[in-house]
Amino acid sequence: IKGNKMATPLSEKLTKFAKKNKFGDNMKDSKFGKISEYISTKAAIINLSISANPTWGVPVGKSIMLAGPTSSGKTQIALSTIKKAQEMGYTIVYWDSEFAAEESIFKAIQADLEDIIHMPMAELEQIKTAFMQMDQEIEEGDKVLHIFDSMGAWITSKTVEDAVNGKEVKDMSIPGSKKGLMTLINQACGKKHMGAIIINHTYANV
């Protein structure tokens, strides 16, 4: 269908090609062209800013970023979303790059601790490898919400090596490595219909 018109012979031909080769489908029937579910942050104003609807929130199949200064409530928003996600049957994967997640904060929201997978790691190479290996264990349709806390703490193995060797140099590879990981997260969420919240200190810190 094109607008209110029926599909043209060409669009039908290309749709058939896409389906036959398992590349895709027309947008009307594409499973990747629709958001199947939203996870509420339990804050109407935040839901509205994310999804343009006060009752929706985090779109499943996409990743969102919560960016702002320290102590601005980013982690609290993520925790509220975790609680709602578990009520909806989601397993939580908590990527703890700040090594700051404590059992007590999850107990405070009455979360199911056994259904939160804690992944404490900060090196980008390690996160990338673990994320892609975990993605192989997840089936399409599995309910998974990834929380990355936080992007600002991501470092490279070079950063660690330089620190060990006492080198006071800026690692220029970090921005590119961060963007590479972000791309993998976005693609994996889209393909497997997972949700992801990436916490960041500032929007410019990418």
Regions inferred by a protein language model and the residue ranges of each:
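The Walker A/P-loop phosphate-binding site
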Residues: 7-116, 131-136
